[in-house]
């Protein structure tokens, strides 16, 4: 993988989280593979490469890549507007989080507790989802910028769905942080669109 593709893998994580949030909000459904991939990414320490963060391959990230391609191509027929809005909001929240050492410390202390729950129940178990959702609520949801999720109120009002959405936003912001650490910047999404697409298309073909 090229350095740009490493960045795109992390950005694919941001967009996958955004797509899954949109699906839960609109349909109340989410794939266990996608949820497992994103929640698992919160708990990986010292990965040998970016793919290891997402379980060792990027099969689960395909939906995220698709949404990212739609955003970069600017084709109205493939652009997923709500996921794009959520993804950009997560990139913005990551910038605010980076300035809050106190919040980073709380997240750093509570993730190992969640790790022990994962070892006991598995990554997509409702207890793990609830713990990740509560961590988001106690930290990132207190920042000035909020992510407004739009969808069917019947889905949004179900506590389990609300927890999944918050947990996915937490995981998406973790991916945004990884993207920054790998050298990603928002201006690239505007100025380097063609270069990013050129590196992104092969990732979609790696079946």
Curated annotation (Swiss-Prot):
It is a peripheral membrane protein. InterPro entries: HflD (IPR007451), HflD-like_sf (IPR035932). SUPFAM superfamilies: YcfC-like (SSF101322). Its main location: cytoplasm. It is found in: Cytoplasm; Cell inner membrane. One of its GO terms (cellular component) is plasma membrane. Keywords: Cell inner membrane, Cell membrane, Cytoplasm, Membrane. Coiled coil: none annotated. Pfam families: DUF489. The keyword Cytoplasm applies. The keyword Membrane applies. Belongs to the HflD family. PANTHER family: HIGH FREQUENCY LYSOGENIZATION PROTEIN HFLD (PTHR38100:SF1). This is High frequency lysogenization protein HflD homolog. The gene is hflD.
């Amino acid at each position: 993988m090229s350095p740009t593709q490493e960045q795109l893998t992390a950005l694919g994580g941001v967009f996958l989280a955004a797509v899954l949030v949109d699906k839960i909000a609109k349909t109340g459904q989410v794939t266990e593979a996608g949820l497992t991939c994103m929640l698992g990414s919160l708990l990986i320490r010292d990965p040998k490469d970016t793919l290891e963060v997402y379980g060792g391959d990027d099969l689960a990230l395909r939906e995220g890549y698709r949404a990212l391609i739609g955003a970069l191509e600017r084709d109205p027929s493939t652009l997923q507007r709500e996921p794009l809005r959520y993804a950009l909001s997560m990139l913005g929240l990551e910038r605010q989080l980076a300035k809050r050492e106190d919040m980073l410390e709380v997240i750093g202390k509570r993730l190992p507790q969640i790790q022990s729950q994962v070892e006991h129940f598995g990554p997509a178990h409702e207890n793990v989802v609830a713990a990740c959702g509560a961590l988001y609520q106690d930290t990132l949801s207190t920042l000035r910028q909020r992510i407004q999720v739009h969808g069917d109120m019947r889905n949004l009002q179900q506590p389990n769905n609300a927890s999944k959405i918050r947990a996915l936003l937490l995981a998406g912001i973790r991916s945004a942080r990884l993207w920054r650490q790998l050298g990603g910047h928002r201006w690239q999404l505007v100025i380097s669109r063609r270069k990013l697409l050129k590196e992104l298309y092969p990732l979609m073909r790696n079946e």
